[in-house]
Amino acid sequence: MCQYSATNGLVNDWHIVHYGTRAVGGVGLLMLEATAVAPEGRITRFDLGLWDDNQIAGLEKITRFAHEQGATTAIQIAHAGRKASHDSPANGGKQLSIAEGGWQTVAPSAIPFDSTEIPPHELNEVEIEHIVDQFTATALRAKQARFDVLEIHAAHGYLIHQFLSPLSNKRTDEYGGSFENRKRLLLKIVTAVKTVWPQELPLFVRLSATDWTEGGWSLEETVKLSDILYQQGVDMIDCSSGGNISTAKIPLSPGYQVHFSEEIKKTGVLTAAVGLITTVEQMNSILAEGKADMIFLGRELLRNPYFPIVSTLGTDREIEWPIQYLRGK
């Protein structure tokens, strides 16, 4: 989950300790937060970035330490689109104008996320191709930073999701209108990224399975897209939802997004379930019933970074404790 703690996109001590602690805590896959492919693609000016070579070394410190603890490492690469240029959540999270230190946002269409926000610039086709190049260059840097898994963030109302949804994409060119056109940007990014990301390393895509709004991006379209991505060599779909429509009513409850994972899994692609999954019993049930192949934890690991090793203590699947912590068993 985003830490909103970087300066100029660079890793600092907070990130090293934060992610290192979760690696010590026994996570199998350590997924870094949404990391911007361009400065203007940041949600806030405090986001991590990987748009420049000078950002590689800090991230490699995280991957090196995590590998030493036995964790596999992953990174989400993202462009926030119209949801960029915000203050940090701790400061209220409002969108910032250029005069307030923000920047011009971009989107498939000049439709703001919220009526109180500044309309984004509608991208032209040359600018869209440049964004594809930015994702590709960032993927190459992720490889150089020694990540084991790459995830393209196409969910939560960020730029790629904005192109997918007919509520935020009103274009009349090859990137808008039909399902075939609205998925074009994501498929171009996947194709381009696969030219630099090693074939033997997994490639994930995070999708919002629904906009939770009539006329928006739907589960049916997500299942169809997931099948196409699977055929194109995507290894796993990270199944989330929402984030694109400010007025959406999301029925929150334990495991409320697991159904999406279960449906998408029918295409044959591996899936990860996420969202209000907080107990070992809940996780084991999801996996045993074949509703997902992997469980992603977010807020639970904010509350308890040692959740994996503590939860398996005394079971037949006990995770090996760091020798420095053996006196705590």
Per-segment meaning from a language model:
Residues M1-K329:
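Flavin-dependent oxidoreductase catalytic cores
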